[in-house]
Structure formats: structure tokens, C-alpha cells
Amino acid sequence: MRIMFIGDIVGKIGRDAIETYIPQLKQKYKPTVTIVNAENAAHGKGLTEKIYKQLLRNGVDFMTMGNHTYGQREIYDFIDDAKRLVRPANFPDEAPGIGMRFIQINDIKLAVINLQGRAFMPDIDDPFKKADQLVREAQEQTPFIFVDFHAETTSEKYAMGWHLDGRASAVVGTHTHIQTADERILPKGTGYITDVGMTGFYDGILGINKTEVIERFITSLPQRHVVPNEGRSVLSGVVIDLDKEGKTKHIERILINDDHPFSTF
């Protein structure tokens, strides 16, 4: 089984990059399933139903979220019925949506779990205990278990990777929007990367205009974050190959921008 996961889609530039590159990436890598993190897809914050459907039309099979899950109020109207979407499972039980879903691809069932960290993030339920619970539940149905851990710090993400080594097929980090070069296979067979990176505006800061961010650092005054609709793009992702027992046998980063052009080789 081959999983292709694309990191945080930020705004229109990120969505356009998905539309442009997903067909080419599918032709090159031939993934069994394509998953994206969509928590910033609607102008940098949240997800609308229109964009959810657009991403599915553009070749995305499944979506994960993060701390901006409820950034667009309309998500309350469709998240419970969005069968190709998960939000962080360690949100309180009262939160709309669900944190683990299964996707069937031919004769393979894949569990997709979304978790959110707590270090320098909102104080929510324990992601480690929730991971234990959901992985146990998933293992009753499938050995193929994919985890998107949406978290701020390298240490918390690495801790989750080690915590789930041998139990989850892969643990990938999202949220910081900067791709890390530490992809590896942990000793018991779990594929891991601290952060997959983002898909969005290449010439800004974490997908937003740089001018306002720089001004805030200089003046310490609040600034409005502006997500541009035009500009050069970056696409960040990872391809993970799993064996028949659900263990990672290969993990490879994807990075496409003007400094790292797409190659069919």
C-alpha cells in the first residue's frame, strides 16, 4: 500500500497547487490513497463545504484537520456528514466531527487518525491517551493505521512517533508549515516525519504575506495576516510504502517549488 500525504493547504494558492500537481504526482507515484491536511484551505483558516468538495474532485481521497478546524462557521453544518474528513480526535467529545475514520481501497482498509498536540497549543484532551484508545480500536479492523499529529513542537511529535512505534503504520507531523528533513522508519516499523510542510504561497512566511509579519516583529503591534490569492507556490508532502503487515518499508519526501521543480523521475 502506498500513501501520499500532502501537508497543510493554505488558501487559494495551495488549492491551485493541489489542482495542478495532484494528477502529475499520482502519475509519478501511483498512490493507493491520497490524503491532505485541509485545516488552512479556506483562505488560511478552516474549510468550507465548497472547498471540501473541490479537493475531492481534484483527486484527494481523504482530509485531516487541526487547530483551525472550526475557522469557518459553516463547517458545523457539514462536518458530521463529511465521510472523507477527520478532525483532531482529542477535541472534547461535544465537538462536532470525528477523529478517526476508515477508508476502503479495494481489499485494503486504512484507518486515518487525526490528533492535536498540547505544547504551545490550546489545552485540550491528552493526545497520547486518545492515540492509545483509537489505535486499539483500529487494530481490531486493520493493520493499516495512519496518524496525522498536528502539533507545534518537535519534541511532542517525536514523542508521539516513538509512543506509537510498531502500532501505527505512520505518524506524520503537521502544523508548522516547514518541511523537516528527518523522515525515517522507527525500529518497530512506523514511518515518521516531524513535519510534512505546507502547500501554499512560497514567497511569504508560513503561507501569508511577509510584510505584515515582519512589521509585527519590528513593532510588536498586532497585524492582520493576509493570505494572498496569487503568487508562486510550494507543495510539500510525503510518500509512504507499507508492507502487508502495515509496517513502513519506504518513506520519501515531496517538495515542489521554483527552486525544486517537479520532476517525473
Language model segments and positions:
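Acidic, metal/ion-coordinating pockets
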Residues: 1-265
